[in-house]
Amino acid sequence: MREQAERLIVRTIPNLTELPKGNSHLTSNIKTLGELREALKKGQRWMGLDLGSKTIGLSLSDVTLTVASPLETIRRTKFSTDVARLLELAAKHEIGGFVIGLPVNMDGTEGPAAQSARAFARNLEKLSPIPATFWDERMSTAAVTRTLLDADTSRARRAEVVDKMAAAYILQGALERLRSIQAKAP
């Protein structure tokens, strides 16, 4: 099954003829926000990920890294299937970096959900050359749910869109921080 997923991944990423061998590429694929920006090629954009136990919310930035928009919610089945869909969308939308929501506890510690997000990123980097960064996603789903409630969105519609909107919320936070960093640069 892993070989089948690897073949699909190699086919969906342009200019990728084989997956990286060994562990030399590990840890180098996880970047700071600034490094992720520097690694971006012209015309590429970022994809935000909100990792849940049952779903993965996805969002896209525009090519100017100004605005994040909800894209899709993947219903999780197994890692290889989930990543194959993720990388298919990454190739389609010319993704140059992933912004992965890191669910840090309110006191700043990392619990099981944050460890799960880090494990997902480690496994993803074994299959993809696309760099990633983490973004503190504390309260992102709660903020989106509150916004949807304020907009009088039905329960069914909220359930349908909350994950991809949370991914957009996460990505937008990272984009705004990037702008802040760039504004302070000499």
Residue map of PLM features:
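Cationic, low-complexity basic patches in intrinsically disordered or flexible, solvent-exposed regions
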Residues: Q4-R7, L19
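Phosphate- and other anionic-substrate recognition elements at nucleic-acid/protein interfaces
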Residues: G22-L49, K54, S59-P186
